């Protein structure tokens, strides 16, 4: 790919970001605060998803396996 094409594409993505978030009307210092808050919120969502989703999936699998008559843990341990 051409370097100019990549640069144009990234500037177009940044322009789309400014339009979607309406942050093009903010002062530069307001934009930096807004971007910092947005990045912090996104980081917290990703971290929380990484920590809590596997736990909830495991609990849901255990719950539904008990409802639909799955084998108990003691039975599985004896069979292996």
UniProtKB/Swiss-Prot annotation:
It is a multi-pass membrane protein. The chain crosses the membrane at residues 12-29, 37-57. One of its GO terms (molecular function) is serine C-palmitoyltransferase activity. GO terms for cellular component: endoplasmic reticulum membrane; serine palmitoyltransferase complex. Keywords: Endoplasmic reticulum, Lipid metabolism, Membrane, Sphingolipid metabolism, Transmembrane, Transmembrane helix. Residues 30-36 are lumenal. Residues 1-11, 58-80 are cytoplasmic. GO terms for biological process: ceramide biosynthetic process; endoplasmic reticulum organization; sphingolipid biosynthetic process. It holds the Pfam family SPT_ssu-like. InterPro entries: Ser_palmitoyltrfase_ssu-like. Pathway: Lipid metabolism; sphingolipid metabolism. It is found in: Endoplasmic reticulum membrane. It comes from the Eukaryota. Component of the serine palmitoyltransferase multisubunit enzyme (SPT) that catalyzes the initial and rate-limiting step in sphingolipid biosynthesis by condensing L-serine and activated acyl-CoA (most commonly palmitoyl-CoA) to form long-chain bases. The SPT complex is composed of SPTLC1, SPTLC2 or SPTLC3 and SPTSSA or SPTSSB. Within this complex, the heterodimer consisting of SPTLC1 and SPTLC2/SPTLC3 forms the catalytic core. Within the SPT complex, SPTSSB stimulates the catalytic activity and plays a role in substrate specificity. Belongs to the SPTSS family. SPTSSB subfamily. Component of the serine palmitoyltransferase (SPT) complex, which is composed of SPTLC1, SPTLC2 or SPTLC3 and SPTSSA or SPTSSB. The heterodimer consisting of SPTLC1 and SPTLC2/SPTLC3 forms the catalytic core of the enzyme, while SPTSSA or SPTSSB subunits determine substrate specificity. SPT also interacts with ORMDL proteins, especially ORMDL3, which negatively regulate SPT activity in the presence of ceramides. This is Serine palmitoyltransferase small subunit B. The gene is sptssb.
